[in-house]
Amino acid sequence: MKTDPNKEKALNAVLSQIEKQFGKGSIMKLGEDRSMDVETISTGSLSLDVALGAGGLPMGRIVEIYGPESSGKTTLTLEVIAAAQKQGKTCAFIDAEHALDPIYAKKLGVDIDNLLCSQPDTGEQALEICDALTRSGAVDVIVVDSVAALTPKAEIEGEIGDSHMGLAARMMSQAMRKLAGNLKQSNTLLIFINQIRMKIGVMFGNPETTTGGNALKFYASVRLDIRRTGAIKDREEVIGNETRVKVVKNKIAAPFKQAEFQILYGQGINSTGELVDLGVQHKLIEKSGAWYAYKGNKIGQGRANAGKYLIENPEVSDEIETTLRAMLLGNGEKIAPDAADTAGDNVDLETGEVF
């Protein structure tokens, strides 16, 4: 189709003026490749990174992780913080539940000496701290644990039994409007941990919902539903959980995928066990009977021993992970242009809402 040269000239002039005033990338054509480059941080689980489609959680976005009690929500966020710190990023943990265990965090690989931590008195204070850290541009990852614990000031100052209908939802809605733009500008990843509640009187469909109203559901680029599916036993002793994570909403790649992995008590995500399983599945690691071999060299009898070998030989582990990431994610941490933002009309599996 022939375009008017004067209109084309005027369009180019106004685009350059907007970019000059508001920064490069403030306006662009939807098909331009640069809009699709999403920097990500690993979740600590390779299978979850693959399920997310981009190699991890996206920077500059809001992410919600929710699930029942003791399902691994905080463990997953601590794994993200550990991965971010290894890349030299600055992280903050807003502990609204006042339940963060620094000893456990250290076991998961978190550098607690350089982790910023706040235990706010009110929900407004927690969200203001988030906003201040975001606007500074100096913090790369912020975790809020949890939305359910963000109690409005009016509720804290009032008496038990007072009605505060919709107060937390209004607070979250206002915060989301304020935070979303600032996060994009500073390229900060903001993760909200959330709890599950039951809707009363629901006869059909899923009665589960998350706290804090609907604003977070709409503003989140990624929503993860994490569940404990079973116990891992060493003889009679329970040593961990089998965990399943569903990508309920995804604005950076195709949604509705899921990942399964193990969370071991006191150790976190069993990443070496995942490498063994994915290596066998994609024929990088040979399995003959109970023996596992890599490039013709035996690495252990049984999955546990093969995993132990990878822990003791990190260079082999890194080589397998790099190869698997290249195979399963294409070019690793970036996603192909045609795969990005395919979820324009995502349907939330839990609520049926369209985003």
Curated annotation (Swiss-Prot):
Keyword Cytoplasm among record annotations: yes
One Pfam family here: RecA
Keywords, comma-separated and alphabetical: ATP-binding, Cytoplasm, DNA damage, DNA recombination, DNA repair, DNA-binding, Nucleotide-binding, SOS response
Subcellular location, record wording: Cytoplasm
GO CC list: cytosol
Annotated ATP binding sites: G67, P68, E69, S70, S71, G72, K73, T74
Disulfide bonds: none
SUPFAM superfamilies xrefs: P-loop containing nucleoside triphosphate hydrolases, RecA protein, C-terminal domain
Record family assignment: Belongs to the RecA family.
Name listed for the protein in its UniProt record: Protein RecA
Source organism per UniProt: Shewanella halifaxensis (strain HAW-EB4)
